[in-house]
């Protein structure tokens, strides 16, 4: 059986550390340019160095995205950026553009090159082409079924790796090649600046009836594709492994630490349980599904993995997100006596019941005993985001634990 890698996204240094602590085998990040997530916090070169050193100290690898579709004016900057990455030492670069690929081969000859899903990797001929060019890994197009991936695996060299998105948001356009953002806002999705107009609300206007706006909605005869559900394959880990997928990729370089920790920890346990004993994996299925439901998400689908998705893979109302738990903060320091320091993310109060989420899989339900600011002044609640607080939980709490609170839905 091939070793399965769990690949987790990180949009900031803090989230990278969370991903590492909560079970990632590898983390993918973006720099301040050329990485298709202009709105993510992204990493300075100094943050990259620190993050890669932290990951390597925990035997975790780090991949840097450089997967824009480059224009002529981008190429000199790409080369200069890759020269800077020599000092950073990423384990691999994720690339979609052949011109950028050639620059990477020349400037970073000892760094693994992975081909992004943006390159429309839908057949084994494409995989073999990139293998001849020197790529170590190809990220499969989201439009592929498990049967197609299995066929690709049978046609490519054994040491070539397949990476696939198995959890998170799906772009409505073929392998992410969308022009809606460009058209409506002038922001290029293929340059990392997508404004996600696929999630907006639309009406139809017939040209001979100006001013008559008809809302787009679903009925028993119609199928609409603008607002996809999120992919979730937590119930299908055996099928993913059987298809020959080497790296299970989670989408979400703009997600919170709570999201990253929850998804990483859940898939880590699911993979490990299955590898240990398939019956253990089946026995713990309800726990996996319950945990995945504790982060903010859209409704779930299996995407294209079992064939073309139908109308049940789309969302037809405006309230697309499901939010069951709120992220309160990550423990930055603990005194060993039940008190911890956090940077507060959302409001909570003394006397409230919250949950301590631990990297080892435990969840501890506790009552907040007291809240103090940095100067030791007590306060009844924490209403100000980013305030540094000392919180007395009277329980086993450690650095990197995450505090979360159940929503009153």
Name every feature range the model reports, one short phrase each:
Residues 1-10, 15-21, 26-29, 33, ...:
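Surface-exposed amphipathic alpha-helical tracts and adjacent flexible/coil segments at the periphery
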Residues 37-56:
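Glycine-rich, positively charged N-terminal anion/phosphate-binding segment
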Residues 39, 117-121, 140, 224:
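Alpha-helix capping and helix-loop boundary segments enriched in small/acidic/polar residues
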Residues 64-65, 95, 115-117:
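Short beta-strand elements of ligand-binding domains
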Residues 75-76, 110-124:
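Gly/Gly-Pro- and Ser/Thr-rich, intrinsically disordered tail segments characteristic of DNA damage-repair
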Residues 99-100:
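Alpha-helix capping/helix-boundary segments
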Residues 105:
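Short glycine-biased active-site loop of nucleotidyltransferases that positions the nucleotide triphosphate
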């Amino acid at each position: 059986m091939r070793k399965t890698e769990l690949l987790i996204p990180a949009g900031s240094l803090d989230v990278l550390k969370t991903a590492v602590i909560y079970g990632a085998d590898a983390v993918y990040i973006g720099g301040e340019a050329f990485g298709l997530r202009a709105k993510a916090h992204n990493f300075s070169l100094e943050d990259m160095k620190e993050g890669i050193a932290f990951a390597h100290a925990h035997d975790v690898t780090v991949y840097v995205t450089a997967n824009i579709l480059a224009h002529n004016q981008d190429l000199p900057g790409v080369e200069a950026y890759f020269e800077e990455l020599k000092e950073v030492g990423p384990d691999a670069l994720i690339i979609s553009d052949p011109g950028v690929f050639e620059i990477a081969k020349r400037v970073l000859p000892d760094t693994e090159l992975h081909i992004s899903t943006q390159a429309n990797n839908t057949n084994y001929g494409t995989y073999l082409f990139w293998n001849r060019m020197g790529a170590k890994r190809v990220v499969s197009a989201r439009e592929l079924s498990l049967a197609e991936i299995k066929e690709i695996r049978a046609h490519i060299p054994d040491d070539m790796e397949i990476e696939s998105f198995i959890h998170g948001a799906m772009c409505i356009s073929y392998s992410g090649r969308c022009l809606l953002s460009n058209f409506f806002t002038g922001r290029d999705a293929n340059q990392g600046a997508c404004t996600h107009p696929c999630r907006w609300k639309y009406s139809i206007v017939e040209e001979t009836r100006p001013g008559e706006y008809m809302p787009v909605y679903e009925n028993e005869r119609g199928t609409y594709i603008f607002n996809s559900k999120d992919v979730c394959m937590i119930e299908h880990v055996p099928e993913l492994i059987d298809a020959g997928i080497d790296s299970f990729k989670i989408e979400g370089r703009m997600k919170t630490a709570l999201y990253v920790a929850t998804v990483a920890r859940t898939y880590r346990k699911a993979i490990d349980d299955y590898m240990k004993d398939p019956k253990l994996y089946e026995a713990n299925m309800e726990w996996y599904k319950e945990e995945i439901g504790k982060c903010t998400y859209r409704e779930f689908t299996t995407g294209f993995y079992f064939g073309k998705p139908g109308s049940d893979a789309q969302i037809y109302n405006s309230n697309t997100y499901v939010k069951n738990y709120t992220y309160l903060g990550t423990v930055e320091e603990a005194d060993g006596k039940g008190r911890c320091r956090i940077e507060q993310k959302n409001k909570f109060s003394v006397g409230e019941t919250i949950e301590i989420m631990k990297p080892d899989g435990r969840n501890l339900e506790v009552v907040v005993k007291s809240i103090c600011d940095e100067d030791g002044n007590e306060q009844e609640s924490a209403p100000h985001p980013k305030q540094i607080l000392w919180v007395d939980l009277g329980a086993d709490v450690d650095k990197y634990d995450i505090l979360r609170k159940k929503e009153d839905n």
